[in-house]
């Protein structure tokens, strides 16, 4: 199969480009970071020579300009197409709780809205003009009254104004400059706006819906207080800078002396206060004193109280039918916990040698010896005890002699025959 020419050509272009970049790197090695004009000019010439060969620089610049023009033409074409065929308008998003009728429909602006009166957004383009910020220091009704002059009235309107101004209802209605509390709450809670209606009757509300001049809201007061506050570090630096250069340097000795002096001053002040209160108490000026101060000023009252106290004890009587469930209570005697010697008369006391001596074995307890066991089974023979006593008397324990001919080969053979001929049923 013959090779693909297009693939070869594409591959050769990439390889050629890599070769050119490699040649440029080799020839300009160590010169890229040089800031001299000659080095930069040399790098530019080498790059141009390797990439474009012996082409004229004017031709290269012309080809680049043509490429740029082509890009600009493409952009212009796209703009014309967008103007002819209007793109899809993105769906509108409004904040939670906002009235959609207060927002102009984006599709209606582009002339693409097909819903008509069913559209939840407004088709009134004049709403955008009403989006200017409303002043909370001006009542809109005052402006309407200023614009509503007598030049525009007819006879019917004039009669209506006269009745309102001089009628009985107007006379009964009190005049006030008090600001509506609902109006203030709406502003404090950021609920005031174009579509806010006063709960006190809307436009019929008798109170003013405008802040008086110089009135400051609570949220603005908090902001001002926060701005006036300074941090603890700034306060310390400010106080320290106000001391000046002529101050005593703080050392351990000076600090301890200052602390001692302050403590003494505090004690002296407390003593002076106590003397003053004592003098007031004696003169009868001190009307409110604590019980502790009474006994401090007149310590003789402590003994008088003990002597003159009424020692009569009162008991609460119980009914005849009730059962006396009295519980005897014994006080704790601390002398019981004092260690002392025990009287051993008439008491059998175990000797301390019980942990080192062993009791004599009985005949019925020698099962381990009969079965060939030794001292590790918990039993000891008389021979072992005698040998142990003799060894302890001599200062050492001798080894027990072992009879090597106790079990000979003949005895073992006889024992095996007896085991084989043993009748298990019996």
Swiss-Prot record:
Pfam family, any one: zf-CCCH
Biased composition (Polar residues): 53-62
One Gene Ontology term, aspect cellular component: cytosol
Biased composition regions of type Low complexity, renumbered to the chain: 1-12
Region (Disordered): 1-30, 53-74, 299-326, 358-411
Domain of life assignment: Eukaryota
Zinc finger residue extent: C3H1-type: 99-126, 174-212
Keywords for this protein: Coiled coil, Cytoplasm, Metal-binding, Nucleus, Phosphoprotein, Repeat, Zinc, Zinc-finger
Coiled coil: 61-86, 218-285
Predominant location: cytoplasm
Modified residues (Phosphoserine): 231, 351, 360, 381
Similarity field: Belongs to the ZC3H15/TMA46 family.
Role description: Protects DRG1 from proteolytic degradation. Stimulates DRG1 GTPase activity likely by increasing the affinity for the potassium ions.
PANTHER family linked: ZINC FINGER CCCH DOMAIN-CONTAINING PROTEIN 15 (PTHR12681:SF0), ZINC FINGER-CONTAINING PROTEIN P48ZNF (PTHR12681)
Protein name: Zinc finger CCCH domain-containing protein 15
């Amino acid at each position: 199969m013959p090779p693909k020419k297009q693939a070869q050509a594409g591959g050769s272009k990439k390889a050629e480009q890599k070769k050119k970049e490699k040649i440029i790197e080799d020839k300009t090695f160590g010169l890229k970071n040089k800031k001299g004009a000659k080095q930069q000019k040399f790098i530019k010439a080498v790059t141009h020579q390797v990439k474009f060969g012996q082409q004229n620089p004017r031709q290269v610049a012309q080809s680049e300009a043509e490429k740029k023009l082509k890009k600009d033409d493409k952009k212009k074409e796209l703009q014309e197409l967008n103007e002819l065929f209007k793109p899809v308008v993105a769906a509108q998003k409004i904040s939670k709780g906002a009235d959609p009728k207060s927002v102009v429909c984006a599709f209606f602006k582009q002339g693409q809205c097909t819903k008509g009166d069913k559209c939840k957004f407004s088709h009134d383009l004049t709403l955008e003009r009403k989006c200017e910020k409303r002043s909370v220091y001006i009542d809109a009704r005052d402006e309407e009254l200023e614009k509503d002059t007598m030049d525009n009235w007819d006879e019917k309107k004039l009669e209506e104004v006269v009745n309102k101004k001089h009628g009985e209802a107007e006379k009964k209605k009190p005049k006030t400059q008090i600001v509506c509390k609902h109006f203030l709450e709406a502003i404090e809670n950021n609920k005031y706006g174009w579509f806010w209606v006063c709960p006190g009757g809307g436009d019929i509300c008798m109170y003013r819906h405008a802040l008086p001049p110089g009135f400051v809201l609570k949220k603005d007061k908090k902001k001002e207080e926060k701005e006036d506050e300074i941090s603890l570090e700034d306060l310390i630096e400010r106080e320290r800078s106000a001391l000046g250069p002529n101050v005593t340097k703080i050392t351990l000795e000076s600090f301890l002396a200052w602390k001692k002096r302050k403590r003494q001053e505090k004690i002296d002040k407390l003593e002076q206060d106590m003397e003053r209160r004592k003098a007031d108490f004696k003169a009868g000026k001190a009307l409110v004193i604590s019980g502790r101060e009474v006994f401090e000023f007149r310590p003789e009252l402590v003994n008088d109280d003990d002597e003159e106290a009424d020692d009569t004890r009162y008991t609460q009587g119980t009914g005849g039918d009730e059962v006396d469930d009295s519980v005897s209570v014994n006080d704790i005697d601390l002398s019981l916990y004092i260690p002392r010697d025990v009287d051993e008369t008439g008491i059998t006391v175990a000797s301390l040698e019980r942990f080192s001596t062993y009791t004599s074995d009985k005949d019925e307890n020698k099962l381990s010896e009969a079965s060939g066991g030794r001292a590790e089974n918990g039993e000891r023979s008389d021979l072992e005890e005698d040998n142990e006593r003799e060894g302890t008397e001599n200062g050492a324990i001798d080894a027990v002699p072992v009879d090597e001919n106790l079990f000979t080969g003949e005895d073992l053979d006889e024992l095996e025959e007896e085991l084989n001929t043993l009748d298990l049923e019996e």
